[in-house]
Amino acid sequence: MANDILLKIEGLRASVEDKEILKGVDLTIRKGEIHAVMGPNGAGKSTLSAVLAGKPQFTVTAGTVEFLGQDLLAMSPEERAWAGIFLSFQYPVEIPGVTITNFMKTAVNAHRAGKGLEPLKAGDFLKLMREKMAFVQMKPEFAKREVNVGFSGGEKKRNEIFQMAMLDPTLAILDETDSGLDVDALRIVASGVNALHTPDKAAIVITHYQRLLDYIVPDVVHVLKDGKIVKTAGKELVAEIEEKGYDNL
């Protein structure tokens, strides 16, 4: 059904510094679906996530992107976030001097303002924060720490899943979230993603490896190679990639 389409990408081409990275990407994501985008290094996976999030260093040269029927490419990065798009970075940045509590309070209330809602009252915000921290198994003392400063790789990724839980996006884009994680951290990240997934929401999981997809089971798997999606199938494609590699698909 057309009304269950969350994201529709047609003929998307994008470049950075006059170098074309995406060379005609077509992708349709429906509500309730988890899509995995796999591919070799340099295929354009992170460029795709950056273009969807609206990072300014990338120039869209052709194609259309609709999110819930709206022209996504016409929106600013802030408007995309307010509309319900969340991007989890491969390398989360450190923000010295800013506690997680203050960072999240600003982010949550900015999202609410973008939707025409009043800021959360202090008590309601702290209650929400406690619930979501417990949800992703973050210790309460993390709230007082500076954002990602001195965090291990696993703590940084867990913090991002916590941010995702707080902002409650309609479309979550996880860009190589499994990078540098041990198995325990991987399980926690995956369980958080799975628990946040509902029939009205969707996720794009961008990864180079199979192991994350042992814990987050995709409905659809795409192989992105040289800026184009060259193969789309069900979750069985993950095992085929593991067996044959990208060159022999």
Q: Where are the regions that the model predicts?
A:
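Conserved structural motif at the start of ABC-family nucleotide-binding domains
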Residues: L7-I9, L22-G24
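Short hydrophobic beta-strand immediately N-terminal to the Walker A/P-loop
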Residues: H35-V37, S49
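The feature captures the beta-strand-to-loop junction immediately N-terminal to the Walker
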Residues: M38-A43
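ABC ATPase NBD Q-loop/coupling interface
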Residues: T64-R80, N148
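ABC-family P-loop ATPase nucleotide-binding domains
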Residues: V93-T170
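Walker B catalytic motif
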Residues: I173-T177, D184
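Conserved beta-strand-loop-alpha-helix hinge in the C-terminal portion
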Residues: V220, L224, K228-L249
